[in-house]
């Protein structure tokens, strides 16, 4: 929720509580409720007027049957926190809007939507995801990928390597992708090849957008583009088929892309927020880890400082 609206919304919540009115929304997103509140003994939760939490789980290319998997996580968290927790599935734009409109309290978000959630809803990241194929534990690389037989070679400096791309065709993931557009374009600007994202055609002969990691990489495999830019973890299934891995190679990499994380709205009281964070961290335990891995192939959640974690994205956006 936006800070300036707290007073008005607080009064509205009071009125709605007295009148017994319940507002439901987010109709474009599937909803499931995991209710284990009968195990909760802490009356202070009710005193703070927090009767349930809503978590948005954005759909991703490597997530299948996400609603059921999210339901299982919500059920686990509900037991740990002691109040009903709703699992909602939708895209990241809908997740940010739900936080802004006070229809959600928590969301799994990548770094750029996390910044948007901070701007619109005063939400902050408290946890980041760790994957086995992240180079920096909770940061990863943006990679320029070329055909294995390409004449383009990695040089002794980023500038020398990227200079070879002049006049070539490039396929970005999408204009909103951090590793597949924002970070690589920022690098091109820093190296002096283009002034901004609107002048990419002055350096490349053709600029394409794959729409997702798989399609961008497929363009490389099929010889339809000279280079594509994706996340390093996209070089593994399900994004890139195992039989195609030896058909491509990394030309250049940019480190420090912030891993996806978990944003919590500022309206969630500190005591509830900490209970939720501690419950989420219990997903790291061996007996619970499969619940976490099933969502997005993450192996661990770690605490992060919101500003420090997202600073690389802030800096990259300045150049783009």
Predicted regions and their residues:
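N-terminal hydrophobic or amphipathic helices and topogenic motifs
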Residues: 2-94, 290-320
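Short, glycine-/small- and polar/acidic-enriched structural segments
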Residues: 43-153
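Periplasmic-binding protein-like
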Residues: 50, 54, 58-60, 126-143, ...
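Second-shell loop/turn segments in exported
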Residues: 60-67, 169-177, 206-207, 221, ...
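Ligand-binding cleft/hinge of the Venus flytrap
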Residues: 72-81, 179-209, 239-243, 316-319
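Short helix-initiation/N-cap motifs at beta->coil->alpha
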Residues: 87-100, 112, 195-218, 256
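A ligand-binding cleft/hinge motif common to bilobed small-molecule-binding domains
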Residues: 111-122, 184-190, 218-246
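A conserved helix-loop-strand patch within extracytoplasmic ligand-binding domains
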Residues: 130-181, 186-187, 191
